[in-house]
């Protein structure tokens, strides 16, 4: 373990091709000693991509327009409204109708890129091509991508951000079945051929660890499957088998990724493009320094290596094979060959870090947690917190964890290109939720972004990690899964009481200043 204390469509497309064709390692960071007095994009490598991120289900709305079919999250929010704060994404923040307005917000932020996802059931309403293609849905993403390029904003497209078509859930259980591999590959291949001449940055899957564990092991997210013995959620799950299903889901997901990437690399329109997976690890510190053992390496295998090791080396980490045993599916030799080297870069979503607490095995109640032999805690055995957590914050702020993870990936996974595909600060404003003036004064979010950019800068300059892009989560407040609309992550405040009006927050103003092509007038030393 390593320890460390802008104007026409043609022009827009040319910009994309120029950046894709550039050297993998961004060039020329300004690596001075100590905390820079003035801090901006000029302190980072030339060609570094700066952006914001969203996901289709969380922002689009318009669930009954353009022949869009239902996803498993539509079903989950309607079937279990109490598990999503009695909210749903039928309207969300209406990005489907307001994307042109929202692209102007991106321009106001001075960003280079925008991460979006394609809603599978908006393209294939029933999950597969033979059951019908929505021409309206296909055209929507053409229009969105064209509008981005017209405004010199690079699209980074996620093929799957958790919205499995409900028809495939009903037919065979979605990712629980190996049948999903063929259907996902068909869908992904369609998007590559449809948009590949315009889009040169792709992600197959967003946060596979969260998708599998939270959906099929602890039941926190859709489809909400778990065993009755899971603390906190077992009483809510109507079906499931913890300790088994999540591993099968991820196995099918990884094979879906491998076959989709094979299709991508044989797609002529996609030539010059790059593709990866967006992982979502936390960093772990030992809760008790006197009893560390192998807990940190093991839990990082379970949270990151579970999906990164197969796409890098062709198989699961040995620690997972040892701990999970027969419950962990096996790859064939042909599948290992297809998986190995199946990403051009590593996407990483980073939010927080935790203390790793050693626990005993529990063979009678298997789960991801008991298999990893690690539970999580925000405090050490001596009562020290992992990081600061403002009263309304959703997660502890520990920016060093970002640097540690980047260095860990470099040292253990072949020094890949890395894109920070999400990094953001969530807050629950409570009784002030609808107070626009209060909600836009998000100084804690500004501080969070500043600290994490400095940590990323250290990883690039001091650890020589090949980071080439950074995306804030999120452009604007949106539907945050089981938290509904209570958790706000945006650089823009959404006024849910007043026609979903967008208001730039303090963090958005700072980010726009940071991204100007010249050094800002503000001094970072004074702000921190």
Curated annotation (Swiss-Prot):
InterPro entries: Glyco_hydro_1, Glyco_hydro_1_N_CS, Glycoside_hydrolase_SF. One of its GO terms (molecular function) is beta-glucosidase activity. Residues 1-26 form the signal peptide. One of its GO terms (cellular component) is endoplasmic reticulum lumen. It catalyses: (+)-abscisic acid D-glucopyranosyl ester + H2O = 2-cis-(+)-abscisate + beta-D-glucose + H(+). It is found in: Endoplasmic reticulum lumen. Hydrolyzes abscisic acid glucose ester (ABA-GE) which represents the predominant form of conjugated ABA (biologically inactive). No activity with beta-D-glucopyranosyl zeatin. The hydrolysis of ABA-GE in the endoplasmic reticulum (ER) forms free ABA and contributes to increase its cellular levels under dehydration conditions. ABA-GE hydrolyzing activity is enhanced by dehydration stress-induced polymerization into higher molecular weight forms. The ABA produced by BGLU18 contributes to the initiation of intracellular signaling as well as the increase in the extracellular ABA level. PROSITE patterns: ER_TARGET, GLYCOSYL_HYDROL_F1_2. This is Beta-D-glucopyranosyl abscisate beta-glucosidase. The lineage of its organism: Eukaryota, Viridiplantae, Streptophyta, Embryophyta, Tracheophyta. Polymerization into higher molecular weight forms displays diurnal fluctuation, similar to the ABA level. Optimum pH is 6.0. Disulfide bonds join 226-237. Induction: By ABA, dehydration, wounding and salt treatment. A motif (Prevents secretion from ER) lies at residues 525-528. Keywords: Abscisic acid signaling pathway, Disulfide bond, Endoplasmic reticulum, Glycoprotein, Glycosidase, Hydrolase, Signal. GO terms for biological process: abscisic acid metabolic process; abscisic acid-activated signaling pathway; carbohydrate metabolic process; defense response to fungus; ER body organization; positive regulation of abscisic acid-activated signaling pathway; protein polymerization; regulation of stomatal movement. Seeds and hydathodes of rosette and cauline leaves. A beta-D-glucoside binds at residues 58, 161, 206-207, 351, 422, 473, 480-481, 489. Glycans are attached at residues 189, 466, 499. It comes from the Eukaryota.
